[in-house]
Amino acid sequence: MFDRWIEDGLQDVLDEEGMGSIAFSPLAQGLLTDRYLGGIPADSRAARGAFLKEADITPARLDVIRKLNGIAAERGQSLAQMAIAWILRGGRVTSALVGASSVGQLENNLGALRQLEFTADELAAIEAVLA
């Protein structure tokens, strides 16, 4: 949701060639989960400075994440589930590469498959938040 460079022509080429694509890090290194809704947890990936940096988690980014979480809640999904469903919408992306550090995270991620469809209003709301 945050890194959409594939939409600038590459996805069209893949469609023309009959090829699928795999979305890497559809949860934005954990940002598109409920983990960062209240800020940066001390034991988080961002606090450790691994791939995700504290500097990447600005108040504006947190505001976007919270708004997306609100849309997800209206859909009856967790933020992670909605983010995965959004990546897989329309069938252009054939797989989403997600990681899980617990069975609970895996089950939550798989829950996205129960509701992959979006209404036009939901997509418009998401686009408005991401703009």
What are these regions (language model features)?
Residues 1-130:
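Beta/alpha (TIM)-barrel catalytic core signal, keyed to glycine-rich beta->alpha loops juxtaposed to Asp/Glu
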